[in-house]
Amino acid sequence: MARPALLGELLVLLLWTATVGQVAAATEVQPPVTNLSVSVENLCTIIWTWSPPEGASPNCTLRYFSHFDDQQDKKIAPETHRKEELPLDEKICLQVGSQCSANESEKPSPLVKKCISPPEGDPESAVTELKCIWHNLSYMKCSWLPGRNTSPDTHYTLYYWYSSLEKSRQCENIYREGQHIACSFKLTKVEPSFEHQNVQIMVKDNAGKIRPSCKIVSLTSYVKPDPPHIKHLLLKNGALLVQWKNPQNFRSRCLTYEVEVNNTQTDRHNILEVEEDKCQNSESDRNMEGTSCFQLPGVLADAVYTVRVRVKTNKLCFDDNKLWSDWSEAQSIGKEQNSTFYTTMLLTIPVFVAVAVIILLFYLKRLKIIIFPPIPDPGKIFKEMFGDQNDDTLHWKKYDIYEKQSKEETDSVVLIENLKKAAP
């Protein structure tokens, strides 16, 4: 009986000793790591490696604490390396220390720092506004603007890499879009988890005169689907039913939809967001794989409806939900009353009204004499009898009754007498 009790006490003593040793090791500050180095793989993969500290406590299960200079991305792990995909646009420094637990509150060893400098070259020569969009999960298109201190005849080269590639590849299809320069390359899903990877992009020139630019593109961001295809439009029971085919490579639950509905009776552009499938009673083949539908109630019977649809990714499957696809090709349905008849009527009615008004004016002028004949005025008779003289007087009043004297003229008068002879 004494031997089992002795063994139990010995086991407890050993456990207590180990615990005390671990606690002592945990509270003890460990030596710093050694041989810290940094290197670059692929295009933008930075790898820091180091060796365990010399003289570490034997009871310590080493963990390594690391973070960047801005105290971001703190990490505690047992590995003696750290790998990150980072753009090489500026100086990047990592600090590493050792400790005996994964507790962040534990004080690590003195930190050792190692930095990597940005690529050589004038920062103003690097390309700007470098962005990449994954189109319909089929190809990636990257575009950029030339740097400020760049020659107009610079020939650019774009390289890309992702984990499924053994080495980086060069994009061959470089072209211009206005002021932007762009390049497209095929990029499809190669494995189920491919969407959760990153693509490393680097743009530089053939002559090595500009600073290379590196960008890390997450495949769950900046995804732009192709426009959907409208399959059916149906007017039934005062409602408009719309069914469309979703773009390939996407599951319906990973997309958000917008439907634009316009009609000839109003000038409003109605854009409606589709939150759920509302075509429960649709007679079309709505259960076909990759199709979605929408129902708009309260449509007008005498109007033509024009419909367009567009889609974007949602955050159920992707990190980004801002890039809408282009609008689908518009399709119309409905019957409108004969607009030619109304147009003709609108043009002819004013002409008829104008002609009728002119005829009526002439007719009223003659009709006035018949309806309103002149009334005899007895006073006019006396006015004519007694008023003529006054009128004549007034008429002659404006004339001068005295004639102006003309100039006197004097003529000589010769008297000729005819003398008769006296009788003898």
From Swiss-Prot:
What PROSITE patterns does the record point to? FN3, HEMATOPO_REC_S_F2
Subcellular location per UniProt equals: Membrane
Tell me which tissues or organs this protein is expressed in.
Spleen, liver, thymus, heart, lung, kidney, testis, stomach, brain, skin, and colon; but not skeletal muscle.
- Renumbered ranges of motif WSXWS motif: 324-328
Keywords in alphabetical order = Disulfide bond, Glycoprotein, Membrane, Receptor, Repeat, Signal, Transmembrane, Transmembrane helix
**Is Nucleotide-binding included in the keywords of this UniProt record?**
no
Cross-referenced InterPro entries: FN3_dom, FN3_sf, Ig-like_fold, Il13Ra_Ig, Short_hematopoietin_rcpt_2_CS, TypeI_recpt_CBD
- Its protein name is Interleukin-13 receptor subunit alpha-1
GO MF terms, alphabetically ordered: cytokine receptor activity
- At which residues is glycosylation annotated? 35, 59, 103, 136, 262, 338
